[in-house]
């Protein structure tokens, strides 16, 4: 080659994961840029001689039209080496070169090249190279038939010369390109090209759009030394004689961006047309190859070309090639005319020679070189290897197939094409002899995998066979061959594997065994019992043959002794019976009327069902099966070559009896029956015992009818002796021939003058003492058919009896659950008693403070909680007369105004007259008692007035207790009298006293005064009574309560202790209540209230949650909307609370608002703030309201709660309070007022002073200029703006200096501006000499020019 050197750029692919590297198409470089919504893209990173590159500009804001194309052309520049030229210029081409792609997507195209202008028109352009290839000098000519140069008529120039380069579009180009002047270009026609040869000496060239988007491409003419083609391979390890794809990226070989295939160049070497790429495959250090011409398989388009160019078929020299693992030389390549070679494909003898001569081994380094025809090349190294051929073992069953697989890496001939190999499959008998062989073609799992496989299945047939298709291999065997057949799989190693792994110079076969998996069959009885009653209606067997489990319903046909599947015999059967006398009867399933067996769900289990009627016919007995008969079923299974057998033996079965008592959960022959704790006379319950008798022999005596029979009920004492009369009862068959007979009896205990009696089905049997503890109820049954007698027993025991309560302490009015647990109260496990169990409670009832408690007794109703439950439960209410008793809810007290006394006790009593300790000597009662302690409930007394309070306020006393809702009370609401609750309130309160005025008011004075009012709500009483200023007269007690101007008021109240007297009962072991009494005492907890009529009010003002009271820095802003600004005014005034002299009894008053800036006045109503404590709204000493501050333009004088603010000044707004607290007589006897006074203020508006000097302008005769000329006059003007929020008078100084020396007197200006207003301040100036003049303007706040707003603005202007 005649370049400076052949540049072998080797791309070494390092494979880390052991598999082939699938590179895919090489990633396209960064050849696109977006800015300002415009994207510019190029098709190639390199441009060179005779090559054309596409440039696309996507601008969605430019219309798709000729005008749009012209607009885009005017916004493109090209720059390199510090020189920038427009896209359309004489240095490039002044022809119309921009076209819009007519696809509706705003793409604009132009094409570029780096080709010198020829001297004349040319229909195509070429270049030549002389290269040394395979030691032979080769003359190469590369022609771009799509590139031409045309000399048009007119002033069209390219690189300063007449004419224009043009590109012929491919004839298959589907779109239209429309140029700047509306010219339309179709496929097969020419477009103009921009030539960049003006920049041929620059390594890089940048194409820019006016929005800032730009792309940079490389110039091959100036920088070919840095150009590098790249090569990537899809494989890292390959066998001998294989081919695969590589990707050769050679940008400079893409002559036409719109042409795939060879890229657009037409190339000849020594006069012979060749493809653009040649390749050399060498075994480095082993055997070198030569370059051979190779056909391009594919030219890959630019990734994402559709998005970049609006068209998908844009190319950049990314060639897909095929290469080979055979060294390319004359020995292993196909010779063509002109001494060219195609990639190697060797014959077997050549293949073997490469192996045996050691040229290709298990580790052969292969290097592949690819080159173009102008000297650019690249290489990649891979590994050639030989691997051992292996076969996978296989196990087949009818249910599960496996893949027949051969791993044959050496047989990969083309990594892009699947191929097949042949293997031999043989069937061998148990001795190892082959009796059937077939050759099977295995396909490759995917191209280049080297794994050859087909699914293989086992089928049942009448004769053995091996067949295959493209989808599977099928091996068919008759059942008798399953257990004695194996497989042998044989494949052929290629010569490489034979040589290196088997040490053979000839091709060797390898084999692996395969297995036929045979499932084990079974024959079992269902259920798994072989000794059965001779009255069993049906027997059933399960024949499980797993080799017939297909997953779908399967049927076997039974004919004679043969069992067949799809006509193929799978088993034989026989049935043999041996009678008790030794007679043998032989037959088969057919003889038992069985013609088929079915596995309904396809799991391989087939059910053999034989009714007893068929068995009787088979035996010849017809009416019965003799006891002792044996029946044997045999099946010979041909899959497993195994005989399966089950033998039944028939026996006679005795009847069975079982009972179920009220408390048992299932039937058995022995149960316990609990006696009721109370006789039927008290609790009318019947207790049922169910009886089940199973007598199949008797049922079969008349199988067509449901029969009845009787059994005896016998009562025995604990010694086993019968007592009383025998009772009979009838049991009935549930259905014809079912053999199950059912019935039931009931038992109770009756009390009469002679004592307690056990009663069965309404008959008194015996005195209860005879059986009370250990007696039996015996159920005796004798079968009418077999005369067998069986019995069941119910053991009689006295019932446990337990009383319980859900809690042992409770509050008055609370609900408490009470229950009795006694199994003797159960009627039946599935019955619920509809009656009640009555027990009793003893307690102390109380009418509240001021009264004494009394002892009372109340019945309690209990109900069975659920069917069959031994628990009878109920709920008692401990003293809430508003609750009505219903069902098992019992309210102990029904008298209104009474409750169970707090601090007392409730006794709950339940008795069992037939107790658990009863014996044959005596029926003993049993007593149960539970105690519930009643909690002491406090009565809380508090004062609701906020402290301190005014002497003129109403006193509010709150009494709180849950007892109030239980005692006498009115409906919730306000009252002027306590009514019937007065005694309770008097009993709670004790006295009201004052420290300074020495008042003493009793509870009776307070509650009965007509000036006192009341509020009641559930658990709360509130008592309100007036206070007034003490006149000074001692001992003047009463209502209103007279207090000093400063005083301390105290409220005391009573508490009550309840005492009950209990007396024990020696007989029952319980206690009884005989009396109760209440003892009052004064509580140590007192409620107090500070009285102070001299507390000054405090006014606070808030804006947006911030306190702005009397704060200049926290003023509210000037209102700038019609809605204005809201200000919260809050006054702390404890002496106004509950004060009758204040409007609304101390809940509201007015304050006066005065704006001192404009003299406006308004009133603002404040409302008392409350807080909820215990459900009661409690007043606070705080009063609040919202004041609205608005602009003067929307203000209406006299509107309450609204005031305006003057703009431009700070508004000081006063808030004044002057309110009468009360009246009093001074020492001279004159009536005087006591007033609450306060005053405060806040500010509206913060003055902002700000002046901005923002711009300097020079005018010459009204026209702006940037410089001055000596002797001419100019207006020097500064822009001044009032950025503050008030009117401002601005003083300013303007100076003009030259070299630091003033050239005219300082000018002082004065101007007044409103907020936001701007003006210009300046002077007329004529420069007298050239130089740089400094012009400065500084704004000041005062006429003394001592307080500047800011540093002003300084400008430097040159005069010439």
UniProtKB/Swiss-Prot annotation:
Question: Which region is the signal sequence?
Answer: 1-24
Cross-referenced InterPro entries: SlaA-like
- Name the source's superkingdom: Archaea
Q: Please give the family membership noted in the entry.
A: Belongs to the Sulfolobales SlaA family.
Species annotation: Metallosphaera sedula (strain ATCC 51363 / DSM 5348 / JCM 9185 / NBRC 15509 / TH2)
Cellular compartment(s): Secreted, Cell wall, S-layer
Q: What exactly does this protein do?
A: S-layer large protein. May form the highly ordered outer sheath.
> What's this protein's name?
S-layer protein A
Cellular compartments per GO CC: extracellular region; S-layer
Keywords of the record: Cell wall, S-layer, Secreted, Signal
Quaternary structure and interacting proteins, as annotated: The mushroom-shaped unit cells of the Sulfolobales' S-layers may consist of three SlaB subunits and six SlaA subunits.
């Amino acid at each position: 080659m005649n370049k400076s050197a052949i540049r072998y750029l080797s791309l070494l692919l390092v494979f880390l994961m052991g598999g082939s590297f699938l590179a895919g198409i090489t990633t396209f470089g960064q050849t696109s840029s977006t800015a300002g919504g415009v994207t510019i893209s190029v098709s190639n990173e390199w441009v060179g001689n005779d090559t054309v590159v596409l440039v696309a500009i996507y601008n969605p804001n430019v219309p798709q039209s000729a005008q749009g194309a012209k607009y885009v052309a005017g916004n493109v520049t090209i720059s390199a080496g510090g020189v920038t030229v427009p896209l359309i210029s004489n240095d490039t081409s002044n022809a119309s070169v921009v076209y819009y792609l007519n696809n509706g997507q705003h793409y604009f195209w132009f094409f570029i090249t780096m080709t010198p202008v020829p001297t004349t028109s040319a229909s195509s352009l070429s270049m030549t190279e002389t290269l040394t290839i395979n030691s032979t000098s080769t003359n190469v000519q590369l022609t771009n038939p799509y590139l031409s140069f045309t000399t048009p008529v007119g002033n069209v120039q390219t690189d300063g010369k007449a004419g224009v380069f043009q590109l012929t579009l491919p004839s298959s180009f589907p779109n239209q390109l429309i140029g700047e002047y509306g010219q339309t270009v179709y496929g097969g026609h020419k477009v103009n090209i921009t030539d960049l040869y003006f920049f041929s000496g620059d390594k890089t060239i940048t194409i820019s759009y006016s929005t800032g988007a730009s792309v940079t491409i490389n110039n091959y003419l100036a920088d070919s030394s840095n150009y590098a083609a790249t090569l990537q391979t899809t494989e890292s390890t390959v066998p001998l004689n294989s081919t695969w794809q590589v990707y050769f990226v050679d940008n400079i070989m893409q002559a036409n961006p719109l042409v795939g295939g060879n890229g657009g160049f037409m190339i000849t070497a020594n006069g012979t047309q060749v493809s653009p790429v040649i390749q050399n495959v060498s075994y480095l250090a082993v055997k070198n190859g030569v370059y051979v011409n190779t056909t391009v398989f594919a030219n890959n388009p630019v990734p994402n070309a559709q998005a970049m160019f609006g068209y998908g078929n844009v190319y950049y020299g990314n060639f897909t090639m095929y290469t080979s693992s055979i060294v390319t030389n004359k020995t292993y390549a196909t010779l063509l005319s002109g001494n060219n070679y195609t990639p190697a494909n060797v014959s077997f003898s050549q293949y073997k020679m490469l192996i045996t001569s050691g040229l290709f081994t298990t580790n052969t380094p292969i290097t592949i070189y690819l080159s173009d025809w102008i000297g650019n090349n690249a290489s990649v190294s891979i590994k050639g290897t030989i691997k051992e051929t292996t076969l996978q073992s296989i196990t087949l069953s009818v249910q599960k197939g496996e893949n027949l697989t051969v791993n044959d890496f050496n047989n990969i001939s083309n990594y892009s094409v699947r191929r097949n190999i042949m293997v031999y499959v043989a069937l061998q008998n148990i001795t190892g002899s082959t009796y059937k062989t077939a050759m099977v073609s295995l396909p490759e799992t995917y191209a280049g995998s080297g794994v050859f496989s087909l699914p293989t299945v086992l089928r049942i047939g009448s004769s053995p066979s091996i067949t295959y298709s493209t989808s599977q291999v099928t091996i068919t065997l008759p059942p008798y061959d399953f257990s004695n057949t194996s497989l042998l799989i044989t494949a052929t190693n290629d010569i490489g594997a034979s040589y290196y792994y088997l040490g053979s110079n000839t091709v060797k076969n390898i084999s692996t065994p395969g297995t036929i998996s045979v499932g084990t069959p079974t024959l079992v009885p269902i259920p798994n019992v072989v000794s059965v009653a001779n009255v069993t209606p049906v027997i059933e067997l399960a024949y499980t043959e797993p080799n017939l489990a297909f997953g779908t319903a399967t049927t076997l046909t039974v004919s004679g002794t043969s069992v067949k599947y799809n006509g193929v015999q799978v088993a034989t059967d026989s049935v043999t019976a041996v009678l008790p006398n030794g007679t043998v009867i032989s037959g088969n399933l057919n003889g038992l009327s069985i013609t088929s067996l079915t596995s309904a769900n396809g799991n391989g289990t087939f059910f053999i069902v034989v009714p007893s009627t068929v068995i009787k016919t088979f035996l010849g007995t017809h009416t019965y099966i003799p006891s002792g008969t044996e029946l044997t079923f045999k099946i010979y299974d041909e899959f497993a070559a195994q005989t399966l057998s089950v033998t039944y033996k028939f026996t006679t079965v005795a009847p069975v009896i079982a009972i179920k008592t009220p408390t048992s959960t299932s039937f058995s022959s022995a149960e316990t029956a609990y006696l009721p704790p109370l006789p039927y006379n008290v609790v009318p319950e019947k207790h049922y015992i169910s009886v089940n008798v199973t007598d199949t022999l008797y049922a079969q005596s008349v199988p067509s009818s449901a029969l009845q029979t009787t059994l005896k009920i016998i009562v025995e004492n604990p010694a086993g002796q019968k007592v009383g009369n025998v009772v009979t009862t009838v049991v009935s068959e549930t259905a014809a021939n079912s053999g199950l007979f059912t019935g039931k009896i009931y038992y109770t205990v009756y009390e009469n003058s002679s004592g307690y009696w056990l009663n069965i089905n309404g008959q008194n049997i015996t005195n209860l003492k005879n059986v009370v503890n250990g007696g039996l109820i015996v159920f005796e049954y004798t079968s009418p058919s077999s005369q067998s007698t069986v019995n069941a027993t119910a053991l009689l025991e006295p019932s446990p009896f337990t009383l319980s309560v859900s809690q042992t302490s409770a509050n008055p009015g609370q609900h408490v659950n009470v229950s009795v647990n006694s199994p003797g109260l159960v009627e039946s496990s599935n019955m619920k008693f509809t009656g009640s169990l009555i027990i009793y409670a003893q307690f102390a009832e109380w009418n509240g403070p001021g009264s004494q408690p009394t002892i009372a007794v109340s019945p309690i109703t209990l109900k069975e909680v659920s069917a069959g439950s031994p628990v009878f439960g109920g709920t008692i209410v401990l003293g809430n007369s508003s609750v009505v008793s219903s069902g098992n809810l019992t309210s102990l007290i029904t008298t209104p105004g009474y409750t169970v006394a707090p601090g007392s006790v409730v006794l709950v009593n339940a008795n069992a007259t037939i107790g658990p300790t009863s014996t044959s000597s005596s029926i003993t009662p049993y007593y149960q008692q539970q105690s519930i302690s009643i909690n002491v409930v406090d009565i809380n007394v508090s004062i609701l007035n906020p402290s301190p309070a005014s002497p003129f306020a109403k006193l509010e006393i709150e009494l709180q207790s849950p007892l109030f809702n239980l005692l006498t009370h009115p409906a919730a609401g306000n009252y002027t009298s306590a009514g019937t609750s007065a005694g309770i309130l008097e009993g709670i309160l004790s006295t009201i006293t004052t420290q300074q005025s020495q008042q003493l008011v009793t509870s009776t004075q307070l509650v009965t005064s007509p000036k006192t009012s009341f509020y009641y709500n559930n658990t709360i009483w509130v008592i309100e009574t007036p206070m007034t200023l003490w006149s000074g007269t001692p001992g003047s007690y009463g209502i209103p309560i007279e207090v000093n101007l400063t005083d301390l008021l105290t409220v005391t109240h009573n508490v009550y202790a309840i005492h009950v007297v209990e007396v024990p009962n020696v007989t029952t072991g319980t206690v009884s209540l005989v009396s109760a009494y209440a003892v009052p005492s004064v509580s140590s907890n007192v409620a107090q209230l500070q009285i102070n009529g001299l507390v000054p009010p405090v006014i606070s003002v808030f804006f947006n949650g911030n306190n702005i009271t009397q704060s200049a820095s926290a003023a509210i802003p000037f209102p700038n909307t019609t809605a204005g600004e809201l200000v919260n005014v809050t006054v702390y005034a404890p002496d106004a609370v509950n004060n009758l002299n204040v409007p609304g009894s101390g809940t509201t008053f007015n304050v006066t608002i005065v704006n001192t800036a404009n003299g406006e006045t308004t009133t603002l109503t404040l409302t008392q703030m409350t807080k909820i404590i215990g459900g009661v709204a409690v007043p606070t000493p705080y009063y609040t309201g919202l004041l609205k501050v608005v602009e003067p333009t929307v203000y209406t004088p006299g509107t309450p709660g609204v005031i305006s603010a003057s703009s431009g000044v700070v508004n000081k707004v006063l808030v004044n309070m002057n309110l009468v607290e009360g009246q009093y007589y001074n020492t001279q006897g004159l009536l005087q007022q006591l007033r609450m006074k306060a005053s405060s203020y806040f500010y509206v508006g913060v003055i902002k002073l700000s002046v901005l000097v923002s711009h300097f302008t020079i005018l010459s005769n009204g026209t702006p200029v940037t410089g001055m000329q000596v002797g001419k006059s100019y207006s020097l003007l500064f822009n001044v703006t009032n950025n503050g929020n008030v009117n401002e008078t601005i003083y300013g100084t303007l100076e003009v200096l030259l070299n630091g020396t003033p050239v005219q007197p300082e000018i002082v200006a004065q101007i007044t501006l409103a907020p936001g207003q701007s003006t210009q301040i300046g002077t007329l100036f004529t420069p007298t000499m050239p130089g740089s003049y400094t012009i400065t303007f500084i704004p000041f706040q005062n006429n003394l020019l001592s307080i500047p707003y800011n540093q002003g603005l300084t400008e430097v202007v040159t005069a010439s």
